[in-house]
C-alpha cells in the first residue's frame, strides 16, 4: 500500500519545550469559516460563533499565551515558554491539549491535523508578529487563509 508522505512541519531536531516565543497558526478543517466572522463597522473585529467562544475559553487557559486572534477559519497565537520547570509543556503538547478540549466540547473535530509554527528569534520579529496578529481582522480579505466559500458557515 502506498501511503502519502506528510510534510514535516516542525523544525527537525528542535526541542519545542525550550524557553522561547512561538508563533502558532491553527486552521479549521477544510478552512471552514466556523469560528466567527469579521464585522466591518466601525472597526474590523471578529464576532465569534459558539465554536469560536469555546475556542476562546480554552485559549485563555494556555499558560504563556501572549497574544492571539481568532479568525473565521484559523487562530494565530504567540506563546512564550519561560521556565525550565516541569510545569510548562512543549508546544506540541499545548496545541494537542487545546485541540482535544475544543473537539470534546464542540462534539466534532474542528481543526486540521497539524499546525504551523515559527520560532520567534528576536524582539523585532516579536513586535512584527504582534502587529500582524492585531491587524489580522482589518486585512482579512487579503489573508492567505481568506475563504469566500461558506462565508458564514457557522450560521447555517
Question: Where are the regions that the model predicts?
Answer:
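Short catalytic/metal-binding and nucleic-acid-binding patches
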Residues: 1-156
Amino acid at each position: 500500500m502506498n501511503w502519502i508522505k506528510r510534510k514535516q512541519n516542525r523544525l527537525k531536531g528542535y526541542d519545542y519545550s525550550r524557553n522561547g516565543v512561538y508563533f502558532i497558526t491553527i486552521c479549521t478543517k477544510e478552512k471552514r469559516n466556523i469560528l466567527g466572522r469579521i464585522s466591518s463597522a466601525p472597526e474590523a473585529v471578529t464576532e465569534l460563533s459558539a465554536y469560536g467562544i469555546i475556542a476562546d475559553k480554552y485559549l485563555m487557559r494556555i499558560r504563556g499565551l501572549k497574544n492571539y486572534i481568532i479568525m473565521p477559519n484559523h487562530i494565530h497565537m504567540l506563546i512564550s515558554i519561560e521556565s525550565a520547570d516541569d510545569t510548562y509543556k512543549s508546544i506540541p503538547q499545548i496545541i494537542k491539549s487545546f485541540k482535544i478540549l475544543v473537539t470534546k466540547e464542540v462534539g466534532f473535530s474542528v481543526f486540521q491535523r497539524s499546525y504551523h509554527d515559527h520560532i520567534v528569534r528576536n524582539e523585532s520579529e516579536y513586535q512584527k508578529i504582534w502587529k500582524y496578529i492585531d491587524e489580522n481582522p482589518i486585512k482579512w480579505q487579503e489573508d492567505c487563509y481568506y475563504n469566500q466559500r461558506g462565508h458564514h458557515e457557522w450560521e447555517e
